[in-house]
Each structure stands twice: as structure tokens, then as C-alpha cells.
Amino acid sequence: MKALLDLFKQVSQDEQFDAIKIGIASPEKIRSWSYGEVRKPETINYRTFKPERDGLFCSKIFGPIKDYECLCGKYKRLKHRGVICEKCGVEVTVAKVRRERMGHIELASPVAHIWFLKSLPSRLGMVLDMTLRDIERVLYFEAWCVIEPGMTPLKRGQIMSDDDFLAKTEEYGDDFRALMGAEAVRELLRTIDIDREVETLRGELKATSSEAKIKKISKRLKVLEGFQKSGIKAEWMVMEVLPVLPPDLRPLVPLDGGRFATSDLNDLYRRVINRNNRLKRLLELKAPEIILRNEKRMLQEAVDSLLDNGRRGKAMTGANKRQLKSLADMIKGKSGRFRQNLLGKRVDYSGRSVIVVGPQLKLHQCGLPKLMALELFKPFIFNRLEMMGLATTIKAAKKLVESQEPVVWDILEEVIREHPVMLNRAPTLHRLGIQAFEPVLIEGKAIQLHPLVCAAFNADFDGDQMAVHVPLSLEAQLEARTLMLASNNVLFPANGEPSIVPSQDIVLGLYYTTRERINGKGEGIFFTDVAEVQRAYDNGEVELQSRITVRLTEYERDDNGEFQPVLRRHETTVGRALLSEILPKGLPFTVLNKALKKKEISRLINQSFRRCGLRDTVIFADKLMQSGFRLATRGGISIAMGDMLIPKAKEGILAEASREVKEIDKQYSSGLVTSQERYNNVVDIWGKASDKVGKAMMEQLATEPVVNRHGEEVRQESFNSIYMMADSGARGSAAQIRQLAGMRGLMAKPDGSIIETPITANFREGLNVLQYFISTHGARKGLADTALKTANSGYLTRRLVDVTQDLVITEDDCGTTQGYAMKALVEGGEVIEPLRDRILGRVAAIDVVDPDTQETAIAAGTLLDEDLVDLIDRIGVDEVKVRTPLTCETRHGLCAHCYGRDLGRGSHVNVGEAVGVIAAQSIGEPGTQLTMRTFHIGGAASRSALASAVETKSTGKVGFASTMRYVTNAKGERVAISRSGELAIFDDNGRERERHKIPYGATVLVGDGEAVKAGTRLATWDPLTRPIVSEYGGAVRFENIEEGVTVAKQLDEITGLSTLVVITPKTRSGKTVTRPQIKLVNENGEDVKIAGTDHSVNISFPVGALITVRDGQQVAVGEVLARIPQESQKTRDITGGLPRVAELFEARSPKDAGMLADVTGTVSFGKDTKGKQRLVITDLEGVSHEFLIPKEKQVLVHDGQVVNKGEMIVDGPADPHDILRLQGIEKLATYIVDEVQDVYRLQGVKINDKHIEVIVRQMLRRVNIVDAGDTEFIPGEQVERSELLNENDRVTAEGKRPATYDNVLLGITKASLSTDSFISAASFQETTRVLTEAAIMGKRDDLRGLKENVIVGRLIPAGTGLAYHMARKDKEALEAAEREAARQLANPFEDAPVTVDADAPQSDAGQEGSAE
């Protein structure tokens, strides 16, 4: 009977668990796992191939080799199950146990575990409070360590060399005890009193105030508390018993030719056993100490390399000089256990093939080759054959299928019907990279794919391959059908735009059809309906592009929401009228009544989705595609040399540019400009010329002359093929056409600097050798970049996914009223992103109030859809406070309200949606489109910086922002002297229309409150130099301006003119050289003071400034004292593209970051120290704060200026950590979102803000404890925000003091590694370190994230899995409650206290359920 039960036990090994705990195994634990001791290094007998007894593959320890058969063959078959053979000692059972039974090795001398020794910071060192160097000396038998000092003056843990030891032994005899090796360390660990240590440390922590000490103590405290809480004993870090891995996990495989392939682990184990046995023998023989010492050291080294080869000393190598793979190597890295086998497995029931286009398919179908389908659906076919009685056994069914009988094909058709398959194209960069389709059987061997899903897969038909997977279980089929079917995924999750937008041929066909031609055949005819138009077109009476008038039926919804037909007359073209047939009900004809370019078609599909729903849109898109292909073919648009029209004006433009360049060269040789300015100007001239040629070419291409009905010549949009391809957005761009028919223009060298001689030819004219050579630079750099980019972009995506993988929508509403105020994004006076785009799909945090009537237009908590955003636009609200993931108060996960709309579905987000992963994919997916390079200012990048004036785009009133300060100079011009001055233009209602930054030193041409018309110049400035402007009048007095010390006379060799240039001061010994500066003196010879203070005006010059005034010269307010040439203002590299995004998400402080004021107060300068200047801010209480700033930095403030907290005081890029510290989370989020968006916008990639916000939320998930209050935390410790809030709630409920904390910004790599889940962190990076730390702390992983659950093989807690886990937990809680109730019913007369007691755990469980 027992055997029967055992049989059942073996089958159902389906344990449910909710958490995984990791710890350090005690020797007893290791022995309890073991089925016997491995005593011999032998593996298998080379003649019989049977395992040696007591060896590494011993059957007695690890189990039989064949199922139910002992080694000597005495017992065979099932009936002897469980018998232990008396001859060979092998238990008769399944051979599978060789994968799970472990053995052990009793070590003759204890051995320290290398992970706890060498993984930095060394855990052994922390517990013992010794340095790693000292512990190593003891462990590897180079020094003695005092264990018990007894009555001697020695200290416990003191290290002594051999000579010292002998001397001390002579002195004290055996009053003290000292040991060497792992025994010493184990003794020290065993005798340490952890509770007392923790108490002393806590006391020291309260008493000390030095930063370094606090850091050191709290680190050690953390480790010791880990031991204390987890109940792990410190001495277990030193091993007495070594577990042996089950043999089938380190197999020995016979190869043909009598050789064996073996796992490296066997070698490593062999070494350990050999050394251990030798040591045992030496101990029995009472060998001399020195031999034993050597043997013990070798044993320690052997165990080290088994656990982590190469971690210490030289790595052990096999016969072929290759490093052996140790246990640690098995789990870490890309090919380790985590990433190779647990997170990415190869899948059964899958196939791959080349894809070809299948334009006849519906959107939800794909063509599957018959042979592939036959192979993939085999089990289903077998089942069907048996059910129909065509085959009696599986074997027979197999035969039928293999001979491909006709009946098999019919059955295949049946089996495949309504059974979706999943198609995947690698690289799968976002969730649209895997979609489900209904298979349609086809001949041939290639998979057919619908053209419209190519955009989502990023596929083309130039040899791409795709993989097919079959969802087997009913649930899987259901999910594939409802969630993954291609026709259910028509929006990009990144931005909510349609993904099934036609491209290329389709666009060209639709565009050609919907263009209008002046005086086409049949122009001006009136038609009754579309059918009549069709007849006329078929008979050749009208042309496709002719303008006609036709009566069309449109459908509009009445009050009941029913469609009512409405007849209207439209002036349109033949093509558009014919297209109107496929328009879904509910869309007006006006959406089609224009030339359909790619953007228009995208908008059309978007409108259709919002108004007509998913089904109609999919059908509409399919029909659009069919029409597009058909019409493109009928249009017969081709491409020819003659289409590339070279502009007539080209020669003139080039001649003019050459003349200007000669002029600049002349100025340079006469010394009016510097060489850098000459280069900048030349590049600028050619850039402008290139643009002019391009413009002339486009103008010539874009229109053509034509005679209209009245015989007049007019110009119409051209029907030139190349122009139509570019204009429709089908293929190519103006820039590419410019290279074909205009001029190629300026080329860059590989380092990014621009070659100043442009390529004046185009591809139609052909390039000469020099021009061709110049252009190869760019092409090769492009190829190299692409290869780098792909790897970098993939790594960025991996880090992003890792940091956000546990973020899931877990509840509907967290109930917060927090949120961020959203405004339209304005840059350089242009609205880059209107307010409607930024708030679409968000939830209003507070009521939106109509500014005119002051009534609530939209209540708080409403999801803002298209109609509501239009309403907000109409009533003229310019700021809306919306909920955001950053202010969500859900502890684990996010709430649906703070997230808003699920962009991939177009509706409110569901609970269980894995929004973290979606955000990571949305940001990572376009990564390959971003550039890799860092720009140098100069060349192309500086061309964008060469704006020299700003004009208003709208009519209104000028308003100066509060930051705007200016002085009026002698000519009556206003000169801006503020660093961050801004001008705004307000319309009649006082709403801000645009806003412009005015740089320092610009001439402002309008006054505050002045009315201006659109196109008015607001300000001008010199783009190539930056002036230093005087704010006061007076006579100049030079200070520290000594030639050869602080300034140099710069003689231009060519011109012979000299200027004073500020240089880095040469320090003479003993003399401190201060900065060159000037003071202003009034008529009486006194210093001019800053208004309202007694500070005198002093203006200091940065290095590289050209001083334009002379000593003693009278200057007026607003006059230029010096100019800083733009290039000497340190050409800062602008990091662009992918590296910039990575930099932002890794929260790196920029190299020469700008400085923000820590406090609000008045600026003054203290005494300069070597190479640094001292800047002092005195706050409102009179406390002064000092900052040391390197001399070469540009200080943006002057003596006596008042600055606000968080304002820039030293020029340079902002440091995100400073922004968080001084301006708070909201400012930081805005900064990161805007900066990331800038990079993507430059490439024309749209990503919704909330994806970036989700990542920022994860970067802010840890906090730094400032004051622990009455909580269990240690000051300076970093903890998970949710953990801290829970603990604070608990403490506050008990009426104690909660902990106070600072926000911490972690980079995505750091944040992933600091997650609470050790499984997730270990599978990401630094596996060894993560596991070591987790084991000491006895960490418990609650399997909250997706990654942990994938690794342990459970359903992920997202989507359908979340519901499954929640239901399971509720059920368990319910069952526990029922058991409890039943128990109480069984013995109702127990005394009261017990029942109360029994109630407690149940309520506890209830709470746990709710907390989840």
C-alpha cells in the first residue's frame, strides 16, 4: 500500500509557494540533504563503464543508472521498488533521482567560503572587523591569529607572524591560544556575541558625529543585524562539510573513440577529494606541522576554485590550459543559468521560415506553409485521427501523417480552424513584436504576412525570417485570440498612434488617386452618385484626377445613436469619389476630400478608430490597402533620370557663395576676423547656399505649368514621380532629392567636424574623385555607428525593463489629489507640443474650471479623452493639473487613475497591466533610430546655434518676465543684462501666446507692455561672440591686468593688430595671482558702488576674453567691456542621441556640472584659494555658505546679487541630483522628461510622457533615512519607499516617532540591483555579490515582480496571472478560516482564552490578503 502511495507522491509534485528564502546552510543541513559521503575521486570504471562505489558517480549514494534496476542486476523491474540491494547497496527506483540526490564530503579541516571572503565588501571582514588582507593571511597560513588572549596583554583577533608567535610563546607559554587557517576564523566567528556587538554599535552610532565613522558602523551594523534577524550563525560562513552536486547535473558522457566529455565540476570535485583524502592520511600519520599547513592551504584553494574559480589567485585550468567552469560561473553572465535557461528558454511547437508578402490576406490572417502546419499541429492531428477511428494507435496515426495521406490534409484544415498561431520577428523590441494570427494553409515554404502589420514588426520582405509558435492549452488559445490577435493591436503602446498605417506603395497609390489635375478630361461634370462616376471612369470619359461635382450619401448619428443617411453635394475629384465607397459609416466625406499624404492617412485611421470603433477601422484599413496597391499599379508611377530636375538658379547661387567666401578670406588676411570665425562663417555660407539650391530645386520640382479650361496658363502641383514619392511620404525626403538633383552640400569628417569645402555636384551630375572620397567618410562612419548602436540600444532596453519589471497596475484608484500642472511645451517661441497632446489620456487631478464662467467644466477623476481635450482647448484653459505615476500613492504598483489611458488599447488601463515593461519597451524600442554620436559645437551643431535675432509669431502685447533685467545705453537701446531673461507675448485676453529667451548682451527692441504685430523683431545679438556689458558708467581702472602674467598681447601674424587676451595666470612663487578685473571710478576718483550696497563694482574677465577697453577710458552704461569669442568658450561636447538618454536614466552627474544655489541669499566673493575662487552666499538669517569654484568655470552671478534657492550660479549642465535636492521631485521629473523627449523629438519619434514618468518613479523608489525615530532603521540606510511608509504607519499607530527621510535618485542599473527581490537582482548583474548579500541577510523574496516569477516558473502577477494569484490567495484565506471554524465547532467547550488565541492568526491572514 505504501508503495502505491509513494507512486502517487512522485506524480503530483505541484507545490504552491508564495515566497523563496535564501540563507547559509549549516553543516547539519548539508548532511541532511546528503544520501552518503563521497570518499573516492574515481568516477566510472573505464572497462565496465559502471560507476565506482563511493566515487563521484556512485549508485549507492546517488541512485540507480537504469530505471528500477540495481547496479549488479540482482533486482530488476517495478515489483522490487524501494528494495535496497544487499550486494551493491543500490536502492531500486527511477534513475531520475540522480538529478536530485546530493552527496557530501567531510572536510578534514574547515574551509572558508570564498564568496563571503572575497566578494567586496568582504562579509567576513565586516563581521570580524578585520581587514581582508589580514583574514587572507590567516586563512592561507601566513600568520597566526589570537583566539583567546587569556591573562596576557594580547588582543583577541590580533595577527602575528611566525616569529612573533614563537617569541610570544616563549614569553607567555600556553596562557593564550592562537590558531591558523580556517579553524582560527571559525573559532573567532563562533565566539562572537552578535547581540552584544549590535548593542555596542548602536550606542557608538548615537555617540559619534564623524561622517566616515557613521558610514563604517552602519555598514557593519547592517550585516550583524542581518545575522541576528535571519538566525544564521556566523560560523557557517566557514564550511566543515561540502555538498556534492547530483551527478546528472555534472554529467560524464562517453564519446565515440573511447574518450569522455565531462563537466568541469567533476575535475574540481576530484581535486577537492584528492587533497582532502591526503590531508586525512597525513593527520592520521601525525605529519609535521609544515606539511599539514601546506596541505590545508591546498584544500582551501581547491574548494575556492570549485565555488568560484579565478576569484582568488590563479584560476585552475584543465589539461588544455582552459579555465575550468566553477559553480559560480554556471549561474552568472549571459550564458549562465539565469539568463540562458530560466529567463529565455527554447520552445517546443515552433518553427521558423522566410516571410513573403500576402496582400490577399485579411488583417488577422497569416499564410502558413502546409508542411510547417502539419509538423506543428501533429498532436492535434493524431488526436483527431484517433477520434474519427482512422487510426487505432498513435503509431498508426504517425504513419498516416508521415505518408501524407489525403485525409490528413482535410483533418489539418479542421484542426487549424480558429486555432491562432503566434508570429514573432526578432528582435522583439516591444509587445507588437509578437502577434497572433489565424493560419491559412498555403503551398510553398514561406510564411505569408499581411503588409499592414509590417510596421509593428518592423519587418520587410528582403529575406527577413519569422518564428511561429503554437499556443497549446485552451487558455493560451483564448489569450492569443483576445489579447494578441493582430486585429486587436492596432495602436502603438508607445504613443497611441495607429500601427496599421499604410506605407510606401499604398500611400503612393492613394495619394495619386486623390490629387487633382487642372483641366483633366471631363472636368466640371455633375454626377448623381458614385456608381455613375464609376461608369464614366470605366468608359474613359473622365480621368482619375479630374475635378467633378457628385452627390454622395453620408451617414450621421441621430439622437438615438442610429445612423441616418444624408445626401450632400460635394465638389471633389473622380478618385476621391470612388474612394468614398470604402469609408466607414460615421466618418464625413470631408476627411477624404484632400490629397492623402501619409500623415493624413494616419490621421484618417486614428479618427476612424476613435469614432467608429476597432472592427470598422480594421476593415477600413484592409480596404484602403487593397485600393492603394491597385491604384499604385494603375498609376504606373516610375522613376527616371529625367525626373531629377537640376535647378536653373544653381550656378548663380554657387557663384555668389564663392564670392562671399573669397570676401571672408580677404577679411581674414587683413586681420578683421580670427581663423575660427572665418571657418564658422565659411561653413555658414556654404550651408545657406546648399539650402538655397535645395529650395530652388524643390520649387522647380513642385509645380509645373498647365493650360486651364479658359486657355490661361497657370501653375499646378507637379506630377513629377520623384516629387510625388517624397510629397506623399511614400519614400524619400526633400534632403535626399536635394542630393539627387540639387547639391550634396557639406560633409563631416569622422570626428564630426565639418569639411569646409562642400560637394557642389549632385548624383545626377556625378561626383569627381575628390568629392567621392570626401563622401566615403560619412558612409563608413554610418555603418560603424549602426553596429554599435544596436548593441547599446539593446543594453539600454534591458536595464529599463529590469528596473520597471515589477510595476503593475494593482488597484483602480489610490485616491490622491496630487498631480502635476501641465502646460503647452514652448521652446524658442514655438509651441512644440500643445497642451491637448500632453494631457490626452490622463486623469484630471482637480476640477478643470472654465476661466470665463468660473464653473467646473470637467470634474476631478475624469479621464480626458479627445472630446474633453477639445473642450479644454475651446474654453481656453492653458494649464491643467493631471494625475501622474509619480504622485501615485499605491504602495506596490500603480493605480489605474494615476496612469490614465492604456495607449495600446485606447481605453482606461486595466488592473494587472504590466505598465512598467510597456514603458521600458516604448523607450527602448526606438533606441536604434537614435544617433550614437556626441556633437562638437562647431560645424553643423553650431549652425543651429547661430540664431541672431528673435521675432514674434503672433500679434499681441509684450510682457517682460520677472527675470528680465536690462540697462539703457547711450544710444537709447535696451541692453539685456540678465542671464535668464524671458519675453512673453500676451493676446487680448491676457493669455500667454509665446515666450522667448533673451541672451545676455542682446539689444532688446521693444518695451514692456508694447503692442506688437506678428513678425516684429524683439531682440538681436551677435551670435559669434558673447559680450561683457557694463551696468554702470565711469572711468575704467585695470586691476591685476599685467601683460605676460594675466593677459597677453595677441598679435595677429597676418594683420599686425594687437588685442589683450586674458590667459591662465602664470603663478610666481609666493605670489597669489588674482583674476584680471576692472573697477569703475567716478569723477572724484572714488569707486562706483553697486546700487543700494557698499560693494564696489568690479567686473572680472574669464580666460579667453578679448578686452576691448583701455585703462582710464570713460565708459557709459550698456557699453561692451570685453567679448568672449564663442569657440574659446570651451567647446562643450553636446552628448546627443542614445548616450544622452542613457546618461539621464543612469542619473549621472555631468562632468562639469553647473552649480545651483543651496540657499536663498546674497552673493559675495571670499578669498580665493589655489586655482579655486570662493563664493559665499549669506542667507536671510545671516548664516554664510561657502562654495569653492574652479577658476575656469563661468560664474553667472556678481557681488551683491540676490539669488534664489535652486538658481544657477555657475554655468554648466544641470545635475539631476541637485535638482531633486533643491527643487523637489516635480522639477526633477519635468527635467528628465523634457531632456529625454528632446532627444527623441529630434529624431521625430513620439513617446508619451507617462512612460518616462514611470521610469522616473522607479528611479525614486528608494529613500535615505535621515533620522530613524522609533523605527528599526539605521540613519543613512537606503530602504524601499513602500517599506518605509509601512513602517512609519505602524510606528505612528503606536504613537511613536516616525522616521524622516530624503528622496534619493538612483540610476536604472543601481535601482535594479537595489530591488528587494534578490532573484531579480541576481539575474540582472553582479550575480555573486547579490546572492552573497541576500544569503547573509537571510532574505525572503515575495515574488512580487514579473522576473522572479518567470524564473521560478509561476504565472506572472500581471494580466490574467494577477487575477489567478489573487483568487488563489483569497481561496487559501477562506479555507484557513473554514478550517478554523470547523475546529471550533468540533470542540466548543474549550476554555475561552484558547479560542481568542486561535482567532489571531486568522485575522492576520485576512490582513495579509488585503495588503497584497
From Swiss-Prot:
Annotated binding of Zn(2+) 2, by residue: 814, 888, 895, 898
GO molecular function, one term: magnesium ion binding
Keyword Nucleotidyltransferase: yes
Binding residue positions for Zn(2+) 1: 70, 72, 85, 88
Xref: InterPro entries: DNA-dir_RpoC_beta_prime, DNA-dir_RpoC_beta_prime_bact, RNA_pol_asu, RNA_pol_N, RNA_pol_Rpb1_1, RNA_pol_Rpb1_3, RNA_pol_Rpb1_3_sf, RNA_pol_Rpb1_4
Co-factor(s): Mg(2+); Zn(2+)
Top EC category: transferase
Comment on bound cofactor: Binds 1 Mg(2+) ion per subunit. Binds 2 Zn(2+) ions per subunit.
Alphabetical list of Pfam families matching this protein: RNA_pol_Rpb1_1, RNA_pol_Rpb1_2, RNA_pol_Rpb1_3, RNA_pol_Rpb1_4, RNA_pol_Rpb1_5
Region ranges (Disordered): 1378-1412
Superkingdom: Bacteria
Gene3D superfamilies, sorted: 1.10.132.30, 1.10.150.390, 1.10.1790.20, 1.10.40.90, 2.40.40.20, 2.40.50.100, RNA polymerase II, clamp domain, RNA polymerase Rpb1, domain 3
GO biological process, one term: DNA-templated transcription
Assembly, per entry: The RNAP catalytic core consists of 2 alpha, 1 beta, 1 beta' and 1 omega subunit. When a sigma factor is associated with the core the holoenzyme is formed, which can initiate transcription.
Protein's job: DNA-dependent RNA polymerase catalyzes the transcription of DNA into RNA using the four ribonucleoside triphosphates as substrates.
Name of the protein: DNA-directed RNA polymerase subunit beta'
Source organism: Bordetella petrii (strain ATCC BAA-461 / DSM 12804 / CCUG 43448)
